[in-house]
């Protein structure tokens, strides 16, 4: 065997394309093939232009070899590939126009002409028999053709599939003719209404006999994995691997889906707004008409001197409409179906889910605050009961201190000394009293305003110093003694008795009040928001600098 044949056998056969490199053979390079050997070989020496799987077909090999021998030896072709003859059927002008107009979009689809013009429903022998009987029984329906019958059946099928997709679960709930007849108006086939009213009982009977499923079986379009399925007539010529969905494709699809949803929502909103505005306009027109009628009624009443109530001239208050629950419509019992479960099987009853009212956040927070206040009040009441027989002397006692009645008669005596008096008068006591009382001596102590022996913290205000006071000097006591509390009472036999006790220490300022106020006189708290931002290029700043320059020039001169 020559080297050409060896290379041809080693070459893997592929599909011939535009960019395929084809070798050129001269007549002297082509070997003389034996017919029997060429029929027995499985792979041709020259590219045949067909797929590799089909090259082994017997009849195809015969046709290829016959054509090759006709080229090489000049003999006539005896075997040809059978093809149908082309002839004019006379209906091309019906579907294809001579004056072709370029469409606005380049969207193409794979539907045939019949699929575009004719309905998907196809009549079977039962439909043909019924349609012939119907035409014979009612001659007025003889004008309708089989195509019209298919359109009616297709319309019924589409409407029931759209409105009742789960009809197979309960066939007794099939829609009546009054609800299906409206679809003929939308599809612009009103001329088929007489035929539809006669065909509806037949279609309803066939649909129920099918168990609620479509009357016409659909073509099963699935994967070609089940090659042994006898019901699949046409299989794909070659199996291609399904393209894997990439992430970018999924994102693009998701964006387009959301865009379409938003556009549909916008369209629905616009339609609802248009309907609302129409209703508002109609309401305004009705109100205006009512107003004109009322004006006419008022004029007639005045003319005829009719004294009646003005109920017709005032709009009555609208009461809220109470929606009454509609009475359940009795439905016929569905046909009894044989259950696949045994006789002992009992379905579980459905659970009644209790619907609870929706709680608001404000209500929950107010309830929590109320519960907290109740718990706090209970704790305070409990603590008050525990501290009932005790006295709390802290600054912020939890319980109120009740002063005993005898202790309320004590009076404070606050002595002070003056530098202008003699040394003997230093030992004498004098009290500024806000209320008149009987003195014990001429310069002796007097009774001041009532104070409790347990609450002497307010005496700090009466002991405040002032730099303007003439008594302020070196002889003044900066740290006065604790005031003496005295109480006058009458004992047995009319004796006058004076009880004396020391009060609690008085908390005083370490420095006079005036000095404390002077310390904070010029103190200004700093705040970042109070910062004043100066603009050097403002008119005020420029005028200020100009005035400084004039002053400097004046001083130099």
Swiss-Prot record:
It comes from Schizosaccharomyces pombe (strain 972 / ATCC 24843) (Fission yeast). Its main location: nucleus. Belongs to the enhancer of polycomb family. The gene is epl1. GO terms for molecular function: protein-macromolecule adaptor activity. Residues 429-441 have a biased composition (Low complexity). Keywords: Cell cycle, DNA damage, DNA repair, Nucleus, Transcription, Transcription regulation. Component of the NuA4 histone acetyltransferase complex. Pfam families: EPL1. The keyword Glycosyltransferase does not apply. One of its GO terms (cellular component) is piccolo histone acetyltransferase complex. Residues 323-349, 424-449 are annotated as: Disordered. This is Enhancer of polycomb-like protein 1. Residues 327-337 have a biased composition (Pro residues). The keyword Nucleus applies. It is found in: Nucleus.
């Amino acid at each position: 065997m020559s080297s050409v044949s060896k290379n041809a056998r080693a070459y893997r056969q592929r599909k011939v394309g535009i960019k395929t490199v084809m070798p050129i053979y001269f007549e002297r390079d082509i070997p003389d093939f034996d017919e029997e050997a060429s029929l027995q070989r499985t792979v041709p020496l020259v590219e045949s232009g067909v797929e590799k799987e089909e090259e082994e077909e017997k009849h195809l090999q015969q046709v290829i070899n016959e054509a090759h021998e006709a080229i090489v030896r000049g003999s006539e072709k005896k075997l040809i590939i059978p093809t149908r003859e082309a002839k004019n059927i006379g209906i091309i002008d019906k579907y294809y126009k001579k004056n072709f107009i370029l469409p606005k979009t380049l969207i193409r689809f794979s539907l045939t002409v019949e699929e575009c013009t004719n309905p998907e429903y196809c009549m079977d022998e039962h439909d043909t028999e019924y349609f012939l009987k119907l035409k014979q029984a009612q001659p007025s329906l003889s004008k309708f053709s089989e195509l019209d019958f298919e359109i009616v059946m297709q319309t019924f099928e589409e409407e029931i599939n759209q409105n009742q997709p789960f009809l197979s679960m309960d066939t007794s709930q099939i829609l009546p003719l009054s609800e299906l007849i409206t679809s003929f108006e939308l599809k612009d086939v009103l001329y088929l209404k007489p035929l539809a009213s006669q065909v509806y009982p037949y279609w309803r009977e066939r649909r129920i006999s099918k168990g609620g499923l479509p009357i016409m079986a659909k073509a099963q379009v699935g994967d070609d994995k089940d090659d042994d399925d006898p019901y699949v007539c046409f299989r794909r010529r070659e199996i291609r691997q399904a393209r894997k969905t990439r992430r970018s494709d999924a994102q693009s699809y998701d964006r387009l889906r959301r865009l379409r949803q938003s556009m549909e929502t916008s369209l629905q909103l616009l339609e609802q707004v248009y309907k609302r505005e129409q209703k508002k306009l109609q309401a305004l027109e009705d109100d205006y008409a009512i107003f004109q009628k009322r004006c006419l009624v008022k004029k007639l009443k005045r003319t005829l001197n009719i004294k009646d109530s003005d109920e017709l001239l005032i709009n009555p208050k609208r009461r809220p409409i109470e929606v009454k629950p509609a009475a359940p419509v009795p439905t016929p019992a569905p046909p009894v179906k044989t259950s696949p479960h045994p006789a002992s099987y009992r379905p579980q009853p459905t659970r009644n889910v209790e619907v609870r009212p929706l709680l608001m956040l404000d209500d929950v927070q107010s309830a929590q605050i109320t519960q907290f206040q109740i718990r706090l009040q209970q704790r305070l009441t409990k603590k008050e009961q525990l501290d009932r027989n005790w006295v709390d002397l802290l600054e912020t006692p939890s319980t109120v201190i009740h002063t005993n009645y005898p202790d309320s008669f004590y009076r404070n005596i606050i002595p002070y000394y003056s530098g202008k008096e003699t040394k003997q008068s230093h030992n004498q006591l004098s009290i500024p009293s806000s209320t008149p009382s009987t003195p014990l001596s001429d310069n002796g102590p007097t009774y001041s305003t009532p104070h409790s022996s347990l609450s002497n913290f307010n005496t700090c205000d009466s002991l405040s110093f002032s730099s303007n006071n003439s008594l302020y000097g070196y002889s003044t006591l900066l740290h006065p003694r604790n005031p003496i509390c005295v109480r006058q009472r009458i004992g047995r036999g009319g004796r006058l008795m004076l009880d004396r006790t020391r009060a609690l220490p008085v908390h005083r300022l370490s420095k006079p009040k005036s000095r404390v106020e002077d310390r904070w006189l010029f103190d200004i708290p700093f705040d970042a928001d109070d910062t004043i931002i100066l603009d050097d290029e403002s008119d005020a700043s420029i005028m200020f600098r100009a005035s400084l320059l004039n002053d400097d020039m004046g001083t130099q001169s």
